[in-house]
Amino acid sequence: MGDLNPAETPEPKKNPVAKIASNLYSTQIVKPVPSVSNSTNLSPCQNPNMTNLFYITLLQNKLNKYTQQLLKKNEEGLNDPLANVEQFNIIQFLQNDVDFNLPIEAFEQGNMDQNIRIDPILQRQQMANQPMLMPQHMLQQLHQQQIYEQQLASMPMTPAITDLTRHGSSSSPSTTNSDPPYSPEGLNNFGLGTQRPNHGVIPNDISNVPQHINRQFNPRMGPNTSPNPPSFPQFLNSNHPTPGSYVQSISPDSNGQGFAQSNLYNALNVSSDESINGSDDIPNRKRPRMDQNMDPSFIMHAPVSGKLGAEVTEEGGQPNIRFFKYQEEQWCPMYDANGEELGRLQVHVLADKGFNYSTNDNCFVNQKKNHFQVTVKIEAIDPSPPQCFKINGVCKPIENFQLSFVGAKSESQNSEIPIRQSTTERKPILHTPVLFKIVERRMTIVTVPRLHFSETTLNNQRKNLRPNPDQKYFNLVVRLYATATDGTTVLMQAFASERVIVRATNPGSFEPPEMVDASWNKNGGILSTNGPVVIGKSEPRAQLTVDGDIYSSGRVMYPSDIRLKDNITEKGAKDALENLQKLRIVDYFYKPEVASKWGLTEDQRKRTGVIAQELAAVLPDAVKDLGDYLTVNESRVFYETVLATQELCRLTGDLDQKIDDKVAEISQRLTQYAQKKKMLNSMASGLNSEGRSLNASRTSLDSSASALTLTNTKKNRRSSRKDKKDAPKSKMTHGTVIGLVGVMAFCLLAMSALYILDWHNRNFGYHHFTPSATTSGPKEGPGNVVIPLDHYVPLRQPDAPPLVPFCPMETCRGYCCMEYDKDHAELEITEYDPNTATDNDFGFKADTRSDFTLKGFGNNVKISLPELGMQIDERYCIEKSCVKKRKVYSLFIPMTRYLPNVPLEVQIDVPSSKVVNNCGYIQEFDNRKCDETGSSSTETDAPRSIQLFDNTFQVSAGQWTQSAYRFRVGYSTELCSIDDTHFGGFYEEYNLIFYRACNRTNSTAINVV
């Protein structure tokens, strides 16, 4: 059989009935099933002759008309695909099965492909029960002939009628006279990039179905568990939203949006007269294009390259306009019949046509006269559909759902633009909402064609072929409403499109292709433009706007020539240092939603910088509002840092100069002080208070003169013995002695004068005494330098009023003066008389001198004792203890014995921009506690300075005979850690020295320690 020539084969076309019969007896694949009326009377045990007669009679009646039609056709007509009865399933045709519509590709396949599979056990049972109509050798011969004839097929059948080019649309419907384009041989295996196994024929075995078909819609799909799957298995079970269950039909333009109609299942249309062609006329070689609805169950999923959803692009790479949620705060939730709140509907809005993206305008453009079409896909994911909604707590049943379209101005969302819809005669009418239904777990697709904007946007006129800066925009708003039975309508969901320009001119003619990039000039490899350039955003904020990071291997250069500048003034650096101290440098992370929008990685989220709002309070000109967010001019902050650095350098230079001057001055003063001290020590050794030093000096002088005379006499005698010519030398010796005596007399006068001055200073000037007996040698007064705070306290302050100057009662107790009373027990105690207290030399004079004027500290700093109602000012300064140039103020505050040993409250008022630093007690000062032994304080027992409130402190001065406390005022809270040598710089220092003045003025005072 394999060596037969096709020319030598029998002529099967002359006897089609014989071929059909041979096919019937040779295949024996499917057992013929009798009609319902005869199925009850037949059984395998009946007479085989009766069975054969039944099948022959049925075959003769069914093929009578069909045989006549085939015999009428000429030889050329047998080439029609419908005339190829080689693979005609006569058993199914005899059964009058409604599902006999086999795919066309089935006629191209032989039985060797085994597209129809039967279980081997069931096949053997059918063969055992089926009567033998022909001998076995005849069946084998017919089967071999059938295989040979199948090998003769060399040309494919006419392809299926499917518009894969998407030329059909709602605006240009296909006609019956148009012919499909020529299809090559492999067209049957082409389906938008989707591979079709088994040459497009779906086998009965459900397990061979590709997995991508099962993922056609949602994962809510189960396998087909039917025990007897039909010839065309249902890929989706009953509870799955199959395309066949869609309420609305799919628009022809929806092809290519993720679904493609399969060209595998074009059924044979049987006419009323049971003929295959439905007409006695001979059909044409080319079948006409038919506008017939495809069975939705045959829609196959065709993967589309690229992104889906809002970023799906149209054919040719044009992006589709995107829709976003709109007025979400006005959405009304839906409820089921039980009053349970349902989830939001899954809505996808797609503009099928009418919107063209303009790269020059950076937005979508719509031509007002050309309509646009919108497809809305709605799916309820809940098991129950929406039944009602609530208004003011009242549940109202839903009667219907409506889909409405309206335009809105981008700059004013409250201004709405009506949408019109053209009729089939292209007559525009006002658009009315479209009614639709929502079925649980089903997808509803609503396509609304022929829509128009009733107005055009403003400022559409171009300026020099560039976008108008005053261009206005529209937004297309899609709203889903729910209407109750009483007429109440609420907004379910709403979506707004991107901004759109609506023009009265066709966008294609408005922007010629050669003029789209007219603003860009290309000169060799250089591309230039005079307009702004935007990367990653839609609106320019500057000449170059970049939404993201900029990587540059070089530097960013900009001109700074003096020829380009005018009104050049030097900026002062006075406030730069203070502004820099107010800046706060922080580490921060961008919010996750911002990082996702800007495309930042986790490492790029962390930044170091300043906060724009905080910087605006310090440097307003460094912050700009360019639209959505505040931006920082970092160069302005940089130059402010340069100014602050210059100010620091200037302050450092001034401090260095002052330090050098002061060191030289102190060195000179120390030299003079050392010379005076040496002279005073030598003079004080020969002076006393009774004037005996003068007699001793005279005696010493006489003794010296006598000794000198005796010596000279002896020398004269020796010299006279040696040489009598030496007599004139004695005269020179007498002159020398007289000169020495004169010098000694002058020295005595000078010493007397110095003694008188020293006595005057000890009795009429401010001096210090040394209460500690352990100190080696007496320490002198301060001189012209700042007083060293060790243990000096003034003996008398006539201008400084003491704390509690007199006893307010007849009998008062004395505090912390036991040691003083022991040392001055022999002194006379006078009665206190308020009338004569001012004339008493031993009392405290609260009045100031006539030449004393209260000036304050000059820095708006006020120190007071609120409990005693006293003001501490310059009256408590002694000689050189308050130096304004150095900003050091040492205030000596006397306390009488009548002040109890209780803590004192000190209040220091400073300007709001400054801070008071509590530095505690002065360690180098000789702090002496009130006790019977009078010993100095230990490390564990020291004066205390505690802050009670802002600028209010409590010191333990009442419990100490003498104690010192230090406070510093400045712009920082770390002033106490600065070295003491940095005077006159960033802070002011106030030293409060409290000491007991124990000279009593009242005999009735009782000493209490």
Curated annotation (Swiss-Prot):
Disulfide bond residue pairs: none
Site entry: Cleavage: P559, S560
SUPFAM superfamilies reported for this sequence: p53-like transcription factors (SSF49417)
InterPro entries linked: MRF-like, MYRF_C2, MYRF_ICA, NDT80_DNA-bd_dom, NDT80_DNA-bd_dom_sf, p53-like_TF_DNA-bd_sf, S74_ICA
Enzyme Commission code: 3.4.-.-
Lumenal compartment segments: 758-1009
Low complexity bias locations: 169-180, 696-711
Annotated Gene Ontology cellular component terms: apical plasma membrane; endoplasmic reticulum; endoplasmic reticulum membrane; nucleus; transcription regulator complex
Cytoplasmic topological domain: 1-736
Peptidase S74 domain sequence ranges: 560-659
Residues annotated to bind DNA: 223-514
GO biological process: cell differentiation; positive regulation of DNA-templated transcription; protein autoprocessing; regulation of neuron remodeling; regulation of synapse assembly
Entry keyword Transmembrane: yes
Enzyme class: hydrolase
Highest taxon in the source lineage: Eukaryota
TM segment ranges: 737-757
Record note on modification: Myelin regulatory factor: Follows autocatalytic cleavage via the peptidase S74 domain. Autoprocessing is apparently constitutive and is essential for transcriptional activity.
UniProt GO MF annotations: DNA-binding transcription factor activity; peptidase activity; sequence-specific DNA binding
Keywords linked to the UniProt accession: Activator, Autocatalytic cleavage, Cell membrane, Cytoplasm, Differentiation, DNA-binding, Endoplasmic reticulum, Glycoprotein, Hydrolase, Membrane, Nucleus, Protease, Transcription, Transcription regulation, Transmembrane, Transmembrane helix
Family in the record: Belongs to the MRF family.
Full protein name: Myelin regulatory factor homolog 2
Provenance organism: Caenorhabditis elegans
